[in-house]
A protein has these predicted regions:
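Bacterial N-terminal signal peptides that target proteins for export
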Residues: 4-20
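Bacterial N-terminal signal peptides
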Residues: 19-28
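Alpha-helical cap/lid subdomain in secreted, periplasmic
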Residues: 8, 12-13, 65, 75, ...
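Serine-esterase "nucleophile elbow" of acetyl-processing enzymes
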Residues: 33-85, 95-103
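N-terminal helical cap/lid subdomain that shapes the substrate entry/recognition surface
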Residues: 86-90
Length: 221
């Protein structure tokens, strides 16, 4: 009886091992078929309240719209929204470490509006943006610089000087460049919130569409 008992146990154990191994083989394709988010190239949108989606519901900011556009076009990027309401270019410098830790392939930089609204000197804005772009360039990160403008009451001289600062910085750092992120929103009803500053969900979709042509040469499939 004892030998039979030993054989029976061996057979059961062997059968259990074979069945378990078979189940692992069946499960393996399910585990490996899922592409980890970390393996997708990261695109960081780094900016102020325009990037953050101030006043909008979840999923309505322009980085959210950009993610949808990229997904539809077959690009497997993971868009990371690093927008902070009220942020100035000084805050952009302070937050660089957080952005660099994400190891992004591309960064869209959108700052400057709050500098103007707070009356910060244009030289300071230019210097801070230069520092941000230098850090990204030194890390071999592709850059898209998104320009902004300010209301007419800031004066034509200041507005033109700000626009020139964006142009010269984009050229210096070999960045893709969109001179005016709000270009597609001008005189289009329903694109700006009641505060007269921030885009609506519709406006965010248009901003994403405005950025995409300049962004595409930086993308890889």
């Amino acid at each position: 009886m004892f030998p039979v008992f030993r054989y029976t146990v061996f057979v059961d154990v062997r059968r259990t091992i074979i069945v378990s191994f078979g189940l692992l083989l069946l499960a393996a394709p399910v585990l490996t078929a899922q592409k980890p988010a970390a393996s997708r190239p990261v695109l960081v949108c780094y900016g102020d309240s325009i990037t953050a989606g101030y006043g909008l519901d979840d999923g309505q900011s322009f980085p959210d719209a950009l993610q949808r556009d990229l997904d539809r076009s077959g690009y497997h990027y993971l868009v990371n929204n690093q927008g902070t309401s009220g942020a100035t270019t000084k805050d952009a410098v302070a937050g660089l470490r957080t952005v660099l830790r994400l190891h992004p392939d591309i960064v869209i930089v959108e700052f400057g509006g709050n500098d103007g609204l707070r009356g910060l000197p244009l030289d300071e804005t230019r210097r801070n943006l230069d520092q941000v772009l230098t850090a990204l360039e030194n890390a071999h990160i592709k850059i898209l610089l998104a320009g902004i403008t300010l209301p007419p009451n800031f004066g034509e001289d200041y507005i033109q000087a700000l626009a020139q600062a964006f142009r010269s910085l984009a050229a210096k750092h070999h960045a893709a460049f969109v001179p005016m992120i709000y270009k597609g929103l001008v005189d289009v009803p329903g694109t700006i919130q009641r505060d007269g500053i921030h885009p609506t969900a519709k406006g965010s979709e248009i901003i994403a569409d405005t950025l995409l042509p300049a962004l595409k040469p930086l993308l890889r499939k």
